[in-house]
Regions:
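Conserved structural motif at the start of ABC-family nucleotide-binding domains
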Residues: 19-21, 34
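ABC nucleotide-binding domain signature
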Residues: 48, 91-103
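The feature captures the beta-strand-to-loop junction immediately N-terminal to the Walker
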Residues: 50-52
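Conserved Walker
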Residues: 58-59
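Helix-to-loop junction immediately C-terminal to a conserved catalytic motif
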Residues: 65
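Conserved ABC transporter NBD signature motif
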Residues: 73-83, 92-94, 128
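Q-loop/switch helix immediately C-terminal to the Walker
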Residues: 102, 108-121
Length: 133
């Protein structure tokens, strides 16, 4: 696994974790991608995930945002276990998202489907969303 490194930019005494991963494990096609990963991200911290290609850095972000669901473990955001939250609910309620390093669209969707997917994250009211796309 890559190295998880935290950089503190300000000191906030007594702050609770904003994002907490507990014992996250993920396997895919008999390959263990993440194995028992746990860490807290507190207010005022910046988190850097360092490591070579293929060790699971992007996978961790995909799990936090709800794009992937781990086989085991908990994801706590603002003291709520969000493991079963849909992507749209997680994104809108907690104002959390992820922009991948290689483009920000889904290759297997049409342009309109991509816009609707982003719209679902940003605009909960379907009538308003559809009128804008």
């Amino acid at each position: 696994m890559g190295i998880i490194k935290k950089f503190r930019i300000k000191s906030f005494k007594g702050t609770k974790p904003i994002i907490k991963l507990e014992k996250i494990s993920l396997s895919f096609k008999k390959r263990q991608i993440l194995d028992n990963i746990s860490f807290n991200l507190n207010q005022g911290q910046i988190l850097g995930l360092l490591g070579p290609n293929g060790v699971g850095k992007s996978t961790i972000f995909n799990i936090i945002t709800g794009l992937l669901k781990p086989n085991y473990g908990s994801i706590i955001i603002d003291n709520e276990n969000v493991i079963n939250y849909p992507i749209a609910s997680r994104s809108s309620k907690f104002k959390i998202g992820y922009v991948p390093q290689y483009g920000g669209y889904f290759h297997d969707l049409t342009l309109i489907e991509n816009l609707k997917a982003i719209g679902e994250i940003q605009i909960e009211d379907m009538k308003i969303r559809n009128s804008r796309i």
